[in-house]
Amino acid sequence: VYALVESDTEKEQGGLFVSNDGGDNWNRVSKDHRLISRAWYYIEVFADPVDENTVYVMGAAGLKSADGGKTWSNISGTHGDYHQLWINKADNQNMVIANDGGAAVTFNGGKVWSTQNNQPTAQFYRINVDNLFPYNIYAGQQDNTSVKIASRNTSGGNITDRQWSYSAGGESAFLGFDPNDPRYVMGGSYQGTIELLDTHTGEGVGVMIHPVQYQAMQPKNMKYRFNWNAPILYSKHEKGVYYHAGNHLFKTKDMGKSWEVISPDLTTHDTAKMGISGFPYTNEGAGGENYCTITYVMESDRENGVIYTGSDDGLVHVTRDGGKSWTNITPKELGEAVVNAIEVSPHDPATVYVAAHKYKLNDFTPFAYKSTDYGNTWTKIVTGIPYGACVRVIREDDTRKGLLYAGTETGLYISYNDGVSWINFQRNLPVTPITDLKVHKNNLIAATQGRSFWVLDELQPIRSFDASATGKLILLPMTEVNRVSGYSIFDSNGEEKAKYPNTTAANPATGAVLYYQLPDSVKSLTIEIKDQNGEVVRSFSNKPKSSNSNNSFRNEPVLTVKKGLNRFAWNLRRQGMPTIDNVYIEGSYAGRKIVPGTYTVTLKADGVEQSTSLIVKADPRINTSAAEFSAQDELLAKLEKDVTDIHVAVTRMRGLTKQIKEMVKLVEQDNSKSEVVTMSNNIVKKITAWEEKLIQPKSQSYDDVINFVNKLSANVIFVHGELNGNVPYVTAGQKARYAELHAEWLIYQKELDELLNKDIAELNARCKALSVANVILPE
C-alpha cells in the first residue's frame, strides 16, 4: 500500500510512505519535494496493478518509480500539470493520463503517448475581441499561453492552428488593446505581472505596477493584492489609456511606464483571510489563492468616467467621475461571493447587470442582478436558472434591448424579457462551464472551461424571435455581409452534416444567410434578389428548375418549406454557367459574385410577399473602388455570356446530330432516300468539325488537359477563372484576350448560322420532298 502524505513543510515530515503489511506499519521511502510541493492543487499516487514496485505520482510533472518509490523519472511526451492516471488491470502497459492539456493514451508503459493536439479541451478565461476583419478572439488559456485566433480563415474552409498565435501575458491573462489598432496588447498573469506585447515585432516588455516577486508571500504582506485573473482593459473613451486592477484600480496613460492609483481599496480588506494559503501544512502561494481582490472591471461604453468594479469577496463599486469618488453599490442580499462579471447595457447607460457565484463556499445557487439606476437598487434575475447552474457572466444583445445571455456552470441560458425569466439554450454546445461571453459582429462568442471557444455565427434568428408570431410567414432581417474568399460547411443547404477534422473549426458561412419562418402547407416558395436598378441577380425556388440545353440549373439549391424556421445560404454568386456532358474542362463554372451594394430580397410564399434589404460590402482589407468592381463585373458578364452561348449551342447541335443519326437509321435501307442519307452524313461531319473547334472531346479526365490542346470554351473559362476572384483586378491582358476569344466565337457563330440556315434548311427541304420527317433544333 502506498500513501502520499502532506505534512508540515518546514519539518520535512511529508512524502511517500509504503506499507508491506496492509497498513499496520509504514516506512517513508521518499521525501522528494516534487511529490508533495503543491498538495492543494494536485498530488495523486497510483500503484501499478501488476508490478508492486512500480508506482506513479501525479503533480507538476508526471513521475514514475520502478523501485518502490526510492528513485523517480519523468513521464514525458504530453502536457504538464498531471491530475489523474488510469492503468489497465489486464495490461499494465496500457494507461490513460490526464493533465491540464487533455488526455493521452499509451500501450507501451509510457514510452510513447498519443497526441493531445486533437482535443478541443482548452480552458479559457476572459474574452476580448478586436474590430479587424476577420476579427480576432483573445483569451488566457489555463496552463498555456494567452491566445489570439482569427474568427475566419479567408484562404480555406476551416480555422486551423495557422490562424492561431500567442498573445501577451500568461495563462490567466485578461487582455487589453485598442480594438481598432491592436498592435500593442497588454496581458496579465498571476501575482500582478503584466506584459506589453508589440505584435508587429513580437517583442514584449514587463510593465508590472510594483515589480515584487509575490509568490509564497502572505497576501496581507503584499503592497497590492492581485487576483489570479486580474482585470486589464483598454479605455473605451481615452485613447492610449489602460486600466488594471488589484485591490485598487490603476490607470496608465503611457503604456505602463507609470501607473496611477485611482481608487481606494475596493475589497473588504479582511486580513483574517489574507494569511498563508494551504494552512496548516503546505504554503500554496502561486496567486490563485489571493483573496480580497478585484475580479472584474467594466467601463461604460455609453458614458465617459463611469466604471464599475467587482471583487472576489462580494463587493460592487461604481465611480461616475473617472475614479475621483467611489460608491459601494453591492446588492444587499449578495453577501460573500465572487463578483465574476459586470455588464453595462448597450442600450441604457443607467442599466447594469452583475453575475456572481459562491461555489467556492459550497453554495451552487445562481446569483444575477439587474439595476436601472447605476446600482442604487437591484433586482434579482435568476428565475429559470436552476440550482447548480452558478452564473458566471451576463451579456445583453447589442441589437435587441432586453435580450440577455447568461453563461453558467452548466451551459447557456437566454432571456427575452430582460432577465424576468430564463430558458436553457444549449443546442450543440457541450455541457461545460462558460467562463465568459461576448456579443460581437452578429456573433455570440463563448469561452468555456474545458471545451475551448464556441461561436454562434448567426444571431439574427435569436434576435428576431417573437413567440406571438409563430405560425406566420416571416422573412427575417438580414445582416451586412462581406464579399470574402474561403468556404465553409455552412455554405451548404443540405440536411447532411459535413465532416471536418476535429483539430479545426468550421468557418462561418461565406455568403448571405437567409432565415424565413413558414406556416403549414406552403406549396410554392421563391426567393428573388434584385439590385438597386431592379435587375434580378438570382432567384431560387422550392421546386427544381427545369433544365434544357442550358443545364446551369442542374445543381441549383432548392428552398426548404418545412413549418417553422428555415435557413438558406447564398454564396453571393450569380447563376453558374452551363456545362458540357462528357468533356472535362479545367476551371470553375461558378457565376461571378455580385458587386458590393444594397439589394432587395423578396420572399414569395403562395402569393404572399415579404422583402428585406441585404447590404453587401467589400472585404475591408481590400483597397479598391466601386468602379473597379463594376469593371470586373462587366468583363465577367461578357465571358459568362460567351461560355453560356458556346455550351448551349454545342448541346443543341448535339441534340440535332442525335436526331439526324436516328433519322438516317430509319431511311438508310431505302434507296430512294439515299440523297437524304448522304446529306445527313455530311452535315454530321460538319457539325462534329465545328464542335471540335469549340471544345476538346478527347479531354475526359483531369490529366487529359496536359495531353490535348484546349479549345475555345476552355480558353474562355480560363480567362474567367483568372478574373473571378474576390479582388477586382482587371488587366489589359484579360481584356485583350477576351477580345480575341470573342472574335473567334463570332466566326464560329457565323459557321453555325450557315449550318442551320443553309445545310439544315436544305436537308429539311429534301426530307419534305421525300416524305421524311424533318429535324428540329432542340431548345
Stretches with model-predicted labels:
Residues 489-526, 530, 567-569, 640-643:
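Contiguous beta-strand segments within globular domains
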Residues 576-580, 604-612:
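Short acidic/polar inter-strand loop motif in beta-rich domains
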Residues 565, 594-598:
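Extracellular Ig-like/FN3 beta-sandwich strand-entry sites
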Residues 605, 612-614, 645-779:
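Mature extracytoplasmic or organellar-lumen-exposed domains after removal of signal/transit peptides
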Residues 1-500, 509-510, 543-545, 554:
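Beta-propeller blade termini and top-face loops
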Residues 195-197, 514-515, 521-540, 598-602:
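Beta-strand-rich binding/interaction modules
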